[in-house]
Regions:
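Extended charged/polar low-complexity repeat regions
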Residues: 1-500
Length: 500
């Protein structure tokens, strides 16, 4: 009687609101009254799959979410830490490393400009139960987070314990990010004005930008001295860019309705495309191109597209079942494709029938992974997956199979066929594919610049190289025979000349 459902559509999702169980204090008068508010305890989709949130009943994390069970039955443990725990951990690490402990306060200010702060942070997420792999759970967290002494997110580590993101913050303004980095990539830095607005974005291996703010106007200048001006209208969440002055002096414009939905766009040549959003849903019901030709779109009461008519008058139609699943699609040429389902709790089809009467069938795992595919000739392909959902084997007819291996970061490292022929793959720290080793031992490689753009590729002993400008555009290509091709661009990055 004290649990509630909330939804904005009969098809869901439904929000389950209730209260979390807690252990009463020793001197508390029982029965304790119910709290005056409800908290989110679960989320149910239209197929009955429930994501359940488990909250701590007692202790320093009482009322906090410390576990999640997804709709497939997997359980995840959310490891929370307090500021005091993180401070103690930092001190212990300093002692074990023989270094001087850094300043790490045991408490944080209770309130910030963003609201109340209890100092609790998410430090790791573990998979603790998997119905498909109950005896093969990961021995490490799926993701781990590091925090600064001021409670700011400092680093993100993936399941291999590799740091994949890092963040740096302003010494004076808590929570103001001044730099961030992806693993293997240069650090991008930011500068701010007194109002907390970004005035500079500094990219050491690419374009940098400056931002100048005026009333209803923002000027953006890159390190090639190209300038764009954004003209805005509206306030807060309804502020929109209504005019854009491009680096070549051309102007494009946009119009919006009273609630901020796009109504029209005018290109640099003065040609206007009009959009007609539905008053209630905001879905586009009509698009009229500059030449006056129109496309129309129609939806059901669940906001699903039921038909679309193009400027040529041809119509595409769709039908759905009571669960909102697509069951039939009629192409503009009249061809009909039907979709069939054998499980009321799944949105994945078990079969498709095309206009020729040919049928393809599929089976799926509880996690939505394709297990088998049978084509219209009756040939069956089977797929094996690991606990992370990656394909580990593909089995085709006549005993032909292909096996995939991955490293701890989830990167494909090897592909082997039934005869034992193996192709191996190597990567750099950023995750770029650097080497492909064929079954005969031959190697093909690629070298990259700081931003991950290929600067040199070698295949069969032949090398091709590329040079880029600060904007990341190819300006010189040297082919395998040593010939050169150069490229020039205009201020809008359009190719205007190719020589070679």
């Amino acid at each position: 009687p004290h649990r509630y459902l909330a939804t904005n559509s009969p098809q869901g999702p439904w929000w389950l609101l209730g209260w979390c169980e807690r252990v009463p204090e020793a001197d508390e008068v029982l029965p304790a009254p119910l709290p005056p508010y409800r908290v989110l305890t679960g989320l149910v989709d239209r197929f009955g799959r429930t994501q359940t949130f488990h909250r701590e009943a007692a202790g320093e994390f009482s009322g906090e979410i410390t576990g999640v069970t997804d709709g497939a039955g997997r359980h995840f443990r959310l490891v929370l830490t307090t500021q005091a725990q993180r401070a103690e951990e930092a001190r212990q690490q300093a002692i074990s490393g023989g270094t001087e402990p850094s300043a790490f306060p045991d408490t944080l200010p209770g309130y910030t400009e963003y609201g109340r702060d209890n100092g609790i942070r998410l430090s790791a997420v573990w998979l603790t139960h998997d119905p498909e792999y109950p005896e093969n759970l990961p021995a490490a967290p799926l993701v781990r987070y590091g925090w600064t002494p001021r409670g700011e997110l400092a680093a993100v580590y993936d399941r291999s314990n590799t740091q994949v993101r890092s963040f740096t913050y302003d010494d004076k303004y808590r929570g103001r990010m001044v730099a961030h980095r992806h693993t293997g990539r240069p650090e991008i830095r930011y500068r701010y004005d007194s109002d907390g607005r970004v005035t500079e974005q500094l990219n050491p291996a690419g374009l940098s930008y400056t931002y100048q703010y005026e009333k209803d106007r923002i000027t953006i200048t890159d390190s090639l001295n190209r300038r764009e001006v954004l003209h805005t209208q509206g306030e807060a969440g309804l502020k929109r860019v209504v005019k854009k002055e491009h680096a070549d002096g051309s102007v494009t414009q946009s119009q919006f309705d009273a609630v901020g939905r796009l109504k029209a766009q005018t290109d640099a040549a003065g040609r206007t495309t009009e959009y007609s959003p539905d008053v209630v849903t905001g879905l586009i019901t009509r698009i009229t191109t500059p030449d006056g030709r129109a496309s129309a779109f129609y939806y059901n009461h669940h906001s699903q597209l039921t038909s679309a008519t193009g400027p040529d008058g041809l119509e595409m139609r769709r039908k759905y079942d009571e669960y909102g699943r697509l069951i039939q699609e009629t192409a503009p040429d009249g061809d009909i494709t039907r979709y069939r389902y054998d499980n009321p709790h799944s949105d994945l089809p078990c079969a498709t029938d095309d206009a020729t009467g040919s049928r393809k069938t599929m089976t799926w795992s509880r996690y939505g992974q394709l297990l088998t595919f049978t084509d219209c000739s009756g040939y069956v392909t089977r797929y094996d997956h690991d606990r992370f959902g990656q394909v580990t084997a593909v089995h085709r007819e006549e005993g032909l199979s292909q096996y995939h291996a991955y490293d701890s970061r989830g990167q494909l490292t090897a592909v082997k066929d039934t005869q034992g022929h193996e192709t191996r793959y190597e990567y750099n720290a950023a995750g770029d594919l650097t080497t492909v080793i064929a079954p005969d031992g031959s190697r093909n490689g690629t070298q990259y610049d700081a931003w991950g753009k290929a600067i040199c590729t070698t295949q069969g002993g032949l090398t091709r190289s590329m040079e880029y400008d600060a904007a990341g555009r190819v300006i010189r290509l040297t082919s395998e025979n040593g010939s050169h091709t150069t490229f020039r661009y205009d201020v809008l990055d359009r190719l205007i000349q190719e020589t070679g």
